[in-house]
Amino acid sequence: MLFSWFKIIIGWKSKSNKANLFEELVGLEWDSKAFMYGRVVNKHARYNLCFDGSSQEPDYPNGRGRIIAWDSVPLLKKIKKSLSKFINGANDLAGEGNYYYDVNKTGISFHGDYERFKVIGVRLGNSMPLYYQWFLNSEPVGTKLKIDLDGGDLYIMSEKTVGKDWKTKSIYTLRHAAGCEKYTKD
């Protein structure tokens, strides 16, 4: 049985540090395209980037997005290193960033992340709520939960909270959504 938990560390990054980290990240070239539906498409809901040991330029027709080397983002690398004090294996983690470039237009609908067991996130920039909803047989069950995240907040999502099992329709699954109302409404 999987248990769901969500941990928030309010104001984990100080005001000056989060501003510097935001500047480091916003200055990167984010993926605004992806290979989906058998073709390259423009991404309107949000932009993404991956972070790992070495850089990779995007090759969208072959399904590969941009990867930024940890050494190219020293402030983000420092966060990853500091997490290793609390989380086993954090030094071996790859990273993914979501860039909600316009909080009035961007977001992601209720979903689970079947490809990962845990999410560790730092909210930067404007405040943005994260929503959770239980589902059974692809239908929402119960009351939607809203968690407000402010710039500098660190959050950790367990395997159940990430929604790793979201494709299993016959059990209760937890899904999450973020962004503007278009993506988070019932």
Question: Where does each model-flagged region fall?
Answer:
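Non-heme Fe(II) oxygenase metal-center motifs and adjacent flexible, charged/small-residue loops
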Residues: 1-186
